[in-house]
Amino acid sequence: MGAMAQNPPNLRPDLAPRLVIDSPRREGQPTIGMVSLGCPKALVDSERILTRLRAEGYAISPDYAGADAVIVNTCGFLDSAKAESLEAIGEALRENGRVIVTGCLGAEPDYVTGAHPKVLAVTGPHQYEQVLDAVHGAVPPAPDPFVDLLPATGVRLTPRHFSYLKISEGCNHTCRFCIIPDMRGRLASRPERAVLREAEKLVEAGVRELLVISQDTSAYGTDWKGPEKFPILPLARELGRLGAWVRLHYVYPYPHVRELIPLMAEGLVLPYLDIPFQHAHPEVLKRMARPAAAARTLDEIAAWRRDCPEITLRSTFIVGYPGETEAEFQTLLDWLDEAQLDRVGCFQYENVAGARSNALPDHVAPEVKQERWDRFMEKAQAISEAKLAAKVGRRIEVIVDEVDEDGATCRTKADAPEIDGNLFIDEGFKGLAPGDILTVEVEEAGEYDLWGRPV
């Protein structure tokens, strides 16, 4: 039997860090495996489930053979993601036979059991108690008088030097192509004190980079009734004082985002914004039920760069949205030329069960979507290549992710794990370790990656 499935990199249009877990097992100790699919928000859910189970005396298995049962935390955002989640469930059933399904696809239990009737239980997203109940029913915890005397150490599914920090759950937007509010509910922000306490513990444990995630990071705290109009601002400021790199993901383009830029210019928060613009033509954005002000967005981008010249802008876009004409797509290409975004992801539109966009007229043919995706990525690649070439000869700070006999794989402040590029050190890397932060001189640039040497 093999190791459990690694997260497919194409499962979701966002981060998909690889699952690596290992835990020593006592003789007779009940053991659970975990396959965690999809985005970092789901990964955090997996970490919480495993932390609770380990506190109850369960061991965590890195492979199917060593597990008494396997939890599959699924993704259900796109039809292609559902298909890959079903494939992962099928693999777990073949390799282990005792499978508990949770996560976004679990919100459709009939869909799951229709494909895999032998699963032990199906629970929805962030239903931690139901998952634990299902585990208890399948693999009862072994009596251990010492477990309750030991503090529960959090299980992390990322390398030790960076960690995802989920600050809220749910979303209040009604984008026609998205069903996240249906699956995960309306915005529910975690108390600032709880977020900061978790962040402090992570930094104390050696985390050098905090990746702030949610469905809508810039809306954090707007579900509260309090004197602070935009609570993400004081939260970001306090996180920045912990001494770790702080990277903001999934920032919806509200006007108050401009107030985060001074924190980046001061060095409290990394000069990096991950903002899903989705498109640039106003009519397409209206059909998406997104803000339709692409020209004003260009003005905002110019202001961000004026106030923080080192800022890196990442965004994602959808091509082939229902009704998208060639002229509307060309507007997107022209906008990309003007915006000169540093990091770009692009996805061909897919129908999602339950999404209102499915009912829109004039769906784009698959071959046209592919052709537009190719053209978009060709332009985005050229922009990336030119921007990276301009960094040759500069000295920049990097964090080390991996070191082997061939060299060190690092990231700059402009690069998030898994979705952005890397900086490679081929010489002078002896003595480096994951989590080290050092200065390098950039010697070579490619389309998405850099090469350099320590200085």
UniProtKB/Swiss-Prot annotation:
Its EC number is 2.8.4.4. HAMAP family: MTTase_RimO (MF_01865). GO terms for biological process: tRNA modification. Residues 30-140 form the MTTase N-terminal domain. Residues 157-386 form the Radical SAM core domain. This is Ribosomal protein uS12 methylthiotransferase RimO. Gene3D superfamilies: Methylthiotransferase, N-terminal domain, Nucleic acid-binding proteins, tm_1862 like domain. Catalyzes the methylthiolation of an aspartic acid residue of ribosomal protein uS12. [4Fe-4S] cluster 2 binds at residues 171, 175, 178. It holds the Pfam family UPF0004. NCBIfam families: 30S ribosomal protein S12 methylthiotransferase RimO, MiaB/RimO family radical SAM methylthiotransferase.
